[in-house]
């Protein structure tokens, strides 16, 4: 199995931080993703963030669902 890269870890940490900052749980994220047409299950969200394995498109979908308009790296 491939090891998690620093870039994957950074992407996952950014998304987790934005969820925490907005006070959004994984369950709420699933609901918000559904509202923008993204069908996802809570267990899948948890696994993606835990592994850091998701696409840039998924990151953007999540950030949009959370309501993030600006991101500082």
Where are these regions (language model features)?
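DNA major-groove recognition helix of helix-turn-helix/homeodomain DNA-binding modules
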Residues: 55-73
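A short, Lys/Arg-rich alpha-helix, primarily the initiator
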Residues: 1-25, 31-32
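Residues within the alpha-helical elements of helix-turn-helix
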Residues: 32, 36, 65
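Recognition helix of helix-turn-helix/homeodomain-like DNA-binding domains
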Residues: 35-53
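Amphipathic alpha-helical interface segments used for dimerization/assembly
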Residues: 19, 26, 62-66
């Amino acid at each position: 199995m491939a090891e998690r890269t620093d870039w994957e870890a950074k992407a996952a940490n950014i998304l987790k931080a934005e969820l925490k900052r907005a006070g959004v749980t994984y369950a709420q994220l699933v609901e918000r993703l559904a509202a923008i047409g993204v069908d996802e299950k809570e267990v899948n969200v948890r696994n993606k963030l835990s592994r850091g394995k998701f696409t840039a498109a998924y990151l953007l979908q999540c950030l949009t669902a959370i309501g993030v308009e600006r991101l500082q790296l």
